[in-house]
Each structure stands twice: as C-alpha cells, then as structure tokens.
Amino acid sequence: GYVKEIYHPDYVAKRMEIGAVMGAAPRRAVIRENSDPGDIIILLGGRTGRDGIGGATGSSKVHTEASIEVCGAEVQKGNAPTERKIQRMFRREEVSYIIKKCNDFGAGGVSVAIGELADGLRVDLDKVPKKYAGLDGTEIAISESQERMAVVVDPKDVDKFLGFANEENLEAIPVAVVTEEPRLVLTWRGKEIVNISRAFLDTNGAHQETTVEVEIPNKDGNLFEERPDVVDVKAKWLETLADLNVCSQKGLVEMFDGSIGAGSVFMPYGGQYQLTETQSMVAKVPVQNGKTDTVTMMSYGFDPYLSSWSPYHGAAYAVTESVARIVATGGDYKKIRFTFQEYFRRMTEDPKRWSQPFSALLGAYAAQMGFGLPSIGGKDSMSGTFNEIDVPPTLVSFAVDVAKIQDVITPELKKAGNKLVWLRAPRDQYDLPDYAGIMDQYEKLHNDIQAGKVVSAYALDRHGIAAAVSKMAFGNALGVKIEHNLDPRDFFAPGFGDIIMEVPADKVGQLSITYTLIGEVTDDGKFSYGNTAITEKEAEEAWKGTLERVFKTTSGEDNEKQAKDDLYHAENIYVCKHKVAKPRVFIPVFPG
C-alpha cells in the first residue's frame, strides 16, 4: 500500500481522507448482461443500521461547532471481516458467472444500490437484514451501512448463489424482484412507501444553472516565477528536508500493513535501511494458481499550495505529477488511466465561489486531452467550509497502470559513481505543461529504463531537486555531490513533472532523453554542493525530526533503566506436570 498525508493550514477547516484501490479479474469472467423481468435481487453481506444515514448529503454540508452533536449518524461503520468474506466469495469464478449485474452500497443505500439495477423494481424493505429493531422504512431505504452488495441473478440460480454465500458465512437474502413495469416501488410493512416512475428518475431532477466568475491567478503568488536568491544553501537544504510536506512520515506509514496478501513489490520505504520514500504503489496481481509477473501501479499527484494560487494549474500539474511518478517507476504512460478525487469549499450563489471547481476541472480536462488519457471515475465533496475557513481547492489525480515486474525500478540510489541527470518537463508561456514535449520525453525515458540505462528515478514536486536527491540517498546511506555550476535557484525550484535519474557513468551518453547532468552518487553519505557539505546525520535528523513527536518511530523506552516494582511476590511457583502446547503466535481478531 501507499500512505501519505498532505498538509496545508486551511485543512484545519476539515480534514479529508481519500483513497483508491485496484481490482483484477480474468477477461473471460467479465460479462455484461441486463436485468430481465422476474430476476431476483439478493442483498449480500452486512446488516443495515442507522449509521450512514444522510452521509451522501452530509458530505456536502457546511459544518459548525454543533456538527459533532448532530451529525453522528452520517458516519458509516466499517466491518473488515465481512468485507474480506465478500472479496473471497466474488473471487470464485463460478460465482461471477451467475451474477448478471451488481452494485455496492454507497450513497443512498438500498434506494440507490438496488434502484440502479433495473428499470422496474419491487423492493421489500422488511426482508432487509437489520442490526437492531426500530428502523422505519425511510431509514432502511437510505442507510449507507457498509459491506453490503446487491446482485441480480436469474431465479434458477438463487439457491446456488445462497449456497456459495453460506460457505463464506455471509448473510444473503432475496429482497427485490425485477418487474416489467418501469417503476421503482419500495414496500414496508405491507404498504407502498415509494412508487416512482423510472422516466421521472431518468430526468435527474430539475434543470439547474449557475453563473461562474473565474478568478485569474495573481502574478505575485506564481510558484514558477518566485525564485529568490539562496544565500545559505545548507540552511535552505535542511529547511526543505524539515518541511511538513517533505519530512519523513514513516511513523504514520508503519501503522498500516504494506505486506497484505504477500503481493507487494514496493514497500513504503525502500533501500537497505528502508528510508527512501517510494512514490508509487506496486503490487503483483493476485493469482490463485501458478505465478505471475504482471504488476499493478498506482500513484497520485497534487500540491495544495499550487492549487491555492491557481486551481487550473494545480489540477493540470496534479495529472502531470501522477503520470511522472508512474513513468519514474518504469511504467508506460500510454497505458495510464486516471481517477480524480475533488474537494472544494461550500458553494453558494456567489459566482466567484464557483471559480475554483470550474477552473480545476477545466485544468484536469485540458491535461487529459493533452496526454490523450481518460479519467474513468471520480468522486467529489463540496463541504470544505467550517465557519469562515475554506479548504484549499483540491483535485487529486490518481494514475493507474499495469506493467511487468522486470520493467519496474525502485527510487533509492544504487551505487557510488553513478551519475545524476535531470529531465525537465517543458512548459509553455503560461507556465502550463507542454504535453507534446512531455510525452516525447516520457516515451524516451520509458525506453531507456527498459534498456537498463536508468537504475533509479524520482519525480520532482514543489520542493525541487534538493528534496528528491536526499530522499533517494537515504535508503542505502549513500551521498550526493551536486555540480557546482548548477544554479542554487534551480536546485530548490518547483519541478512538477521533472524527473531525476540515476544512470551508470558508462551509459550517460547512451540516453535518448534531453537531460542536464547535475551530480554524482558518492559512498561517504555526505550531501555536498560547491562549498556546502551536509553530513548524513544532519540531513536525516532534519528529515526525521519534524513529525517524530506526532508519529513516533521509536518507543522511547529504555527497558534496562526501568525500575522493577513487583506488585506481588510468590514464595512458590507451581508448574503443571502435564505437557501442554506452547503457542508461539497470538492473533487477536476484532470484527468492526
């Protein structure tokens, strides 16, 4: 897995957790069928409760100090063991063949998850399994309780499907039937509480329009033009490593298991000392029999400070950055697909407040058209306002790709004597990505990686070369010597879309990309630039220290110095004379 927190002062308004996962299935198991009259809809998995009622609309509400008292029901409660059972059941090929259509229970609960499966439906809410008594029909219909699936099966396959569910100890109940008349009907306690025409639902409600007044970015805050002179390189370098969005988050990352399923190709931190932060999540496709060399790749791109200055630039470079990280890992950019997660301040009738989502989505659209790559999904929230505080305009781009494991490279520096080269992503006169130029360079870099000319690579962000080469070096305790003729302003300047590469000295001349030679890998652990030298200890202390008190990487306890204070002292110790098993592992399991 891959875990990362992004910091900006305005996220004090409301934090947001976003994530993405990838699934895989054999092509032969992918079927597209329609729901026919008489088909049965089965509710599979967890029970329904009051948790999650109003969650969909709640995600776009303004919150105040009183929200904690009145919004508790909007929060769903997960149930990981049930989720795992559903995954295991759906992985069975014979199960996939009898499912005609399926839907997960997200926003809107039963009314949406089941309501989307066919034009005509009759749903019996009394049959929906409940966590406890007392829920009325409306609550059952709109609850967003998690770990539930709705599947459409042929009547002759119902018993077979219920048998498969029973083998996984999953509750599965037929709750609805597909009807010929195109109406959505919900019944509760023998009465119809909803009876709506499908034609009416298909109108998507009343037509709405709004006026948008686009705010032009201020020249004064342009990150690309702000290139102040660097007076003290060492102080600036250490300050960069200590930045909240650069520093080590290893204490946080280690709270999550990066080895689930034994398919991880990249651990969150790489190198002999596990200190080089990886930029992509790479894992083998899980197979039940045999072995595979196919891997899935996922990366993200987003910078809150760039987006705060210009949502258009922020979204365009979010897409570009997510592509760059896949390319730096060895992926082929031409196979990438995106999914976007958006998060903006609360919209009102003020035309200027609509400027942020309008500009950001326009920038993301321009990037997709520029790369010729589509976004196949996304999710948004318009609730990022707390009283007078608004979150930064947020459009996070997730890029996904597939590759062969032998084509993937890791980001930590490999060997002293190798050269460091810099691929610059070309920009136009408006400081926007030159997509044609970038694609040309990324294509050449991909070929160079496959040819073994590049042994590690790192995509740059707002913090430039200094942060990237330092992180690359930490993993194997190597050093970096930067060319003295490199402009210090370039060393710390934002480099969205740029990539730093480690290349064996004898292969630098064979590169097909356009590059700048910026330095060399050393074995002394030092970071040097002209007359400036930073020891490995100084660099790591700056990088690790910022969040150590928040996300600890050491326990802070010295067992040898702990005073012994026996609460009870036994005169005699009694041992069972019969031999008993000695457990070596204790695994507690707590269903959520």
Residue locations for each model-derived region?
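Glycine/proline-enriched, intrinsically flexible loops and inter-domain linkers
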Residues: 1-592
